[in-house]
Curated annotation (Swiss-Prot):
Residues 179-746 form the TBDR beta-barrel domain. CDD domains: ligand_gated_channel (cd01347). The gene is pfeA. Residues 82-102, 235-254, 397-424 are annotated as: Disordered. This is Ferric enterobactin receptor. Induction: By iron and enterobactin. Belongs to the TonB-dependent receptor family. Specific receptor for the siderophore ferric enterobactin. The lineage of its organism: Bacteria, Pseudomonadati, Pseudomonadota, Gammaproteobacteria, Pseudomonadales.
């Protein structure tokens, strides 16, 4: 891959820590003491953004009341603006749904654990339609070891840089403390329908002091979710003929996951803390027959119920925190390594994303991420009370994928400047960033937060991300909040890599029926989005009501090309001289909607909480097609009753609005038949409760999908040879499921 290199030394990003030490030492070197008069300290910009209309917090108590069966995405999806979708509107890998914030897609959702990026899903091959065979990155931390989850949407998320154009999910774990505490939790669920996979998990956590200045935290987890039966969707599949007669779209695959993580916190001085952390996780699937095009072969059938992909994630980090006379500082260095081991798949046409019987066995793709981050927060009085944040960041991502760059050019013809075989399996990218934010108190109740972030990508080049957020108290009870920011996402390593090649004999070629290639493009621009929101909130005596309008003007979204850039030379028969497409930037797209919240205290201990997301539009402005298949509206409602000091009861319901499929097929023609099918509105209700048996023991029980509303996957959104499209019916919604949980703590 070509690159515009930027020399960078990651340890320079720890300069904030070194600067803080230097300033502190200068003030203490002669024994002098810096005395500060009484002053108001304004919150940092990061703290202030958590009060923005596009920010929601999920607490440990919330998780205990609505325990996920295995993956945290199950509770994150209940926040305003959040749904579970695929990366595109194709419906491929339809049951591998991930967090989608404000309709921008999972690839534009940045996942963090304790403020540090999680990138394991980027080790999974990126398909022609923009999908990955991935469960996402929200299942690396056991639910019972989470302190809180911050869900940050819109302009407030732009400060986090690459990949946060839709939003950020920051999973905060329970930390080391001054007293010894521990917990052991078990959870099991029991689907009413035996064809649906059950879940069970067990986790432990232990934290406390080792010495006066040394403390620790360790947690572990083992969990299993069984796969659905391979034929769960029989009788619901789209029409299939010829070689595809009798094939079925798969249900939800299962997963076995194990996690262990340890943290050591050393209080160097009263002002400084140094943390060392290491973690290891393993996730392995339980295969139920899913392929990219919902087709099948004997190899697929042989592997039913077996493990066909394994993800091994290792993380190592060191973090320094300082509280100084002049402000505070944070610096960390994190190394993340993901080994993605899976069965070899085809890369051409209908065989893309299906096990390759001619190349049986596993391969391993390895992704290495290095992140260095440093920032200082400086309280100032320059006309107004304010806190200035200055920081820098350096990231490097290296991918070695020996399977995904193996498509040859014998049939379609040779491509100028590309080796027909034995291409490099390696790709990499580096980003250097500087950022500044200033949280200014213009008057009591009025906060203005301007910000600017500069990112230099060694292949894509420079990106500037300005932002401006405002919070103004109209009255003691009513607050107006507004924000605008330019967010961005760099192309991923597959899109940028000219050695990454896919092939089709014509079925997947836009605008024509002859053969074609899709090639990586190192001339891509970064995706950008100007995110705007305007919200108003009323709050008084537990009553909270808010309404927020948001609009994202999306530019340079990266999709597979719509026009050939060249033609191959030579080849075989009717497939010779294949058209050459490449990943390209779509000029303009738009996402627009409303978010509402309403919390009503009905009586002592009884509260009714609601949030609504209503999508006004989500479309590619060039084609008019949808960006992703999301419900027209989503309403989450919960009645929460603290019946006694020991007993808590909840009733929940989520209504999903109509879901419309994409309008155009792979050739650019209007879809017909079952590919037009929409999903009608539906609701999922639940009941749950927790009871504290003693000071150290609590019991939970409940039922999900109380009224047994089930959905079945019919196929992908649009068809291929022998398989009709399924429209929006691309995923399974499991039926009534009972669960129990037990937690012991001290």
């Amino acid at each position: 891959m070509s690159s515009r290199a930027l020399p960078a030394v990651p340890f320079l990003l720890l300069s904030s820590c070194l600067l803080a030490n230097a300033v502190h030492a200068a003030g203490q070197g002669d024994g002098s003491v810096i005395e500060l008069g009484e002053q108001t300290v304004v919150a940092t910009a990061q703290e202030e953004t958590k009060q923005a209309p596009g920010v929601s917090i999920i607490t440990a108590e919330d998780i205990a009341k609505r325990p996920p069966s295995n993956d945290l995405s199950q509770i994150i999806r209940t926040m305003p603006g959040v749904n579970l979708t695929g990366n595109s509107s194709s419906g491929q890998r339809g049951n591998n749904r991930q967090i989608d914030i404000r309709g921008m897609g999972p690839e534009n959702t940045l996942i963090l654990v304790d403020g540090k990026p999680v990138s394991s899903r980027n080790s999974v091959r990126y398909g022609w339609r923009g999908e990955r065979d991935s469960r996402g990155d929200t299942n690396w931390v056991p639910a019972d070891q989470v302190e809180r989850i911050e869900v940050i949407r819109g302009p407030a998320a732009a400060r986090y840089g690459n990949g946060a154009a839709g939003g950020v999910v920051n999973i905060i774990t329970k930390q080391a403390g001054a007293e010894t505490h521990g917990n052991l939790s078990v959870y099991s669920n029991f689907p009413q329908h035996k064809a649906e996979g059950a879940s069970e998990r067990m986790s432990f956590g232990l934290n406390g002091p080792l010495t006066e200045n040394l403390s620790y935290r360790v947690y572990g987890n083992i969990a299993k979710t069984d796969s659905d039966d391979w034929d769960i969707n029989a009788g619901h599949e789209s029409n299939r003929t010829g070689k595809q007669a009798g094939t079925l779209p798969a249900g939800r695959e299962g997963v076995r996951n194990k996690d262990i993580d340890g943290l050591l916190s050393w209080r160097l001085t009263p002002e400084q803390t140094l943390e060392f952390e290491a973690g290891f996780s393993r996730q392995g699937n339980i295969y139920t027959g899913d392929t990219q095009n919902t087709n099948s072969n004997n190899y697929v059938k042989q592997m039913l119920g077996h493990e066909t992909n394994r993800m091994y994630r290792e993380t190592y980090s060191v973090t320094h925190r300082g509280e100084w006379d002049f402000g505070s500082s944070l610096a960390y260095l994190q190394y993340e390594k993901t080994r993605n081991s899976r069965i070899n798949e085809g890369l051409a046409g209908g065989t893309e994303g299906i096990f390759d019987p001619n190349n049986a066995g596993f391969y391993t793709a390895t992704l290495r991420d290095l992140t260095a981050h440093g920032e200082v927060n400086l309280p100032l009085h320059l006309g107004y009370e304010q806190t200035l944040t200055l920081g820098s960041e350096w990231t490097e991502q290296k991918l070695d994928d020996p399977s995904s760059n193996t498509q040859n050019t014998e049939e379609g013809g040779s491509i100028p400047g590309l080796a027909g075989k034995n291409r490099s399996s390696s790709s990499s990218a580096r980003i250097f960033s500087l950022f500044a934010e200033d949280n200014i108190e213009l008057m009591p109740g009025t906060m203005l937060t301007p910000g600017l972030r500069w990112d230099h990508h060694d292949i894509v080049g420079d990106n500037w991300s300005p932002s401006l957020n405002l919070s103004h108290a109209l009255t003691e009870r009513v607050t107006l909040k507004a924000g605008i920011a330019r967010a961005y996402k760099a192309p991923n390593l597959y899109q940028l890599n000219p050695d990454y090649l896919l092939y089709s004999r014509g079925q997947g070629c836009y605008g024509q029926s002859t053969s074609c290639y899709l090639r990586g493009n190192d001339g891509l621009k970064a995706e950008t989005s100007v995110n705007k929101e305007l919200g108003i909130e009323y709050s008084h005596d537990g009553l909270v009501a808010g309404l927020t309008y948001f609009r994202n003007d999306y530019k340079n979204k990266i999709e597979s090309g719509l026009s050939p850039v060249d033609h191959a030379s030579g080849g075989k028969g009717d497939y010779a001289n294949a058209a050459i497409y490449q990943w390209e930037n779509v000029p303009k797209a738009v996402v627009e909607g409303l978010e509402g919240t309403l919390t009503l205290p009905l009586a002592d201990g009884l509260k009714w909480s609601n949030n609504l997301t209503y999508m006004l539009q989500s479309k590619n402005k060039e084609t008019g097609d949808v960006l992703s298949v999301t419900p027209r509206y989503t309403l989450n409602s919960m009645l929460d009753w603290q019946a006694t000091d020991d007993l808590s009861l909840q009733a929940t319901v989520t209504w999903y609005g109509k879901q419309k499929p994409k309008k155009y097929d792979y050739h650019g023609d209007r879809v017909t038949g079952s590919a037009n099918d929409q999903l009608s509105p539906y609701a999922i209700a639940g009941l749950g409760g927790t009871y504290r048996l003693s000071k150290n023991l609590s019991l939970g029980a409940g039922v999900d999908n109380l009224f047994d509303k089930r959905l079945f996957r019919a196929g992908n959104a649009q068809g291929v040879v022998g398989i009709d499209g399924a429209g929006a019916a691309t995923y399974n919604e499991p039926g009534r499921t009972f669960y129990t949980s037990l937690t012991a703590s001290f």
